[in-house]
Amino acid sequence: MTNIRKTHPLLKIVSTSFVDLPTPSSLSSWWNFGSLLGVCLVVQILTGLFLAMHYTSDTATAFNSVTHICRDVNYGWILRYLHANGASMFFICLYLHVGRGLYYGSYSYLETWNIGMLLLFAIMATAFMGYVLPWGQMSFWGATVITNLLSAIPYIGTELVQWIWGGFSVDKATLTRFFAFHFLLPFIISALVMVHLLFLHETGSNNPTGIPSNPDMIPFHPYYTIKDILGFLIMLTVLSLLVLFSPDLLGDPDNYIPANPLTTPPHIKPEWYFLFAYAILRSIPNKLGGVLALVLSILILAIVPMLHTSKQRSMMFRPMSQCLFWLLVAYLLALTWIGGQPVEHPYILIGQMASVLYFLMILVLMPLTSIMENLLLKW
């Protein structure tokens, strides 16, 4: 009798994707983050769904509804903090996943990489809109400052901002539409994830060596299912520790003050996972220039495949490129730190230097180093 798993139309898709999928035998723990992102997405959708049952998207009651969830709803506090800190875990996994792709040359799979970039932008948009919903001081002023950046677009900027706001300032209309989009986008993200996996399974996974591993494949189950489950346990343990012991560690205390359009917080800043881009934005004195640098800091990932000049795919056997890669990581960490500091000396200068080095590294130094490595290896 034939196994139903291999004949049933629906089960066959699941089977070829998660059971019988031929997978390189040399995948390291850096390949765990894709499945961890899937777990994060499920956690966010489930906790978000239950939070939406009690949340009201009205400026008069939004802040109080979040307080009500934490105080009066059964296990509402754990849902709220799982959702807030789950977003942080999401971005940690996301940045590690992208970093893995850059290090091991996974961007050679252009369709998978481009869908991944769409996913990155969609997740960033979702997280930004979610941060506005509790309607605290940082929610309100963060929304005002970030949406106002669109006014830098020549000719249509001001009209565009007012169209997004639904009025002349961030108000009830803005909050309602942000809630609607924050609820909708995760389902669009889920669809994009399926397309991402579809393209990945067309080519098969990359591996740490960057060398085709067709002669040495193993089935996904049981080898990588067990490995992924270990990853889930580690991530969920870290998330649980964060939620149960220091739930406000990554948040901003100003968000416990109800939104007040009449008083500005001393230092407006986004959540920690956007600080690197915020630092790049602030390091350019011109408004339009800053907005362009902000967008390009993430959009630069789209041209990374074109800047690949090495004859090798992965950085595993390229020590000079490895040094530059870890310097790039250091610049990103420096930018994250600077984004959380006030705009004063010496932070301004450090931010400007780190911003220039970030772009210089990706656009000039890494491609040149790859060419030099080719020459050293007489390729």
Swiss-Prot record:
An annotated GO BP: mitochondrial electron transport, ubiquinol to cytochrome c
Q: What UniProt keywords are attached to this protein's entry?
A: Electron transport, Heme, Iron, Membrane, Metal-binding, Mitochondrion, Mitochondrion inner membrane, Respiratory chain, Transmembrane, Transmembrane helix, Transport, Ubiquinone
The cofactors required by this protein are: heme b
One cellular component (GO) term of this entry:
mitochondrial inner membrane
Question: Where along this sequence does the record place binding of a ubiquinone?
Answer: H201
Q: Which InterPro entries match?
A: Cyt_b/b6_C, Cyt_b/b6_C_sf, Cyt_b/b6_N, Cytb/b6-like_sf, Cytochrome_b, Cytochrome_b_C_euk/bac, Cytochrome_b_N_euk/bac, Di-haem_cyt_TM
Keyword presence, rRNA-binding: no
**Major place of localization?**
mitochondrion
CDD domains, per this entry? cytochrome_b_C, Cytochrome_b_N
The protein's location, in the record's own words, is:
Mitochondrion inner membrane
Cofactor note from UniProt? Binds 2 heme b groups non-covalently.
- What is the membrane topology here? Multi-pass membrane protein
Q: What does the entry list as the binding residues for heme b b562?
A: H83, H182
Similarity comment:
Belongs to the cytochrome b family.
Task: Cite the record's note on assembly.
Answer: The cytochrome bc1 complex contains 11 subunits: 3 respiratory subunits (MT-CYB, CYC1 and UQCRFS1), 2 core proteins (UQCRC1 and UQCRC2) and 6 low-molecular weight proteins (UQCRH/QCR6, UQCRB/QCR7, UQCRQ/QCR8, UQCR10/QCR9, UQCR11/QCR10 and a cleavage product of UQCRFS1). This cytochrome bc1 complex then forms a dimer.
Job of this protein: Component of the ubiquinol-cytochrome c reductase complex (complex III or cytochrome b-c1 complex) that is part of the mitochondrial respiratory chain. The b-c1 complex mediates electron transfer from ubiquinol to cytochrome c. Contributes to the generation of a proton gradient across the mitochondrial membrane that is then used for ATP synthesis.
Question: What more does the entry say?
Answer: Heme 1 (or BL or b562) is low-potential and absorbs at about 562 nm, and heme 2 (or BH or b566) is high-potential and absorbs at about 566 nm.
Protein name, entry field = Cytochrome b
Q: What is the lineage of its organism?
A: Eukaryota, Metazoa, Chordata, Craniata, Vertebrata
Q: Which gene encodes it?
A: MT-CYB
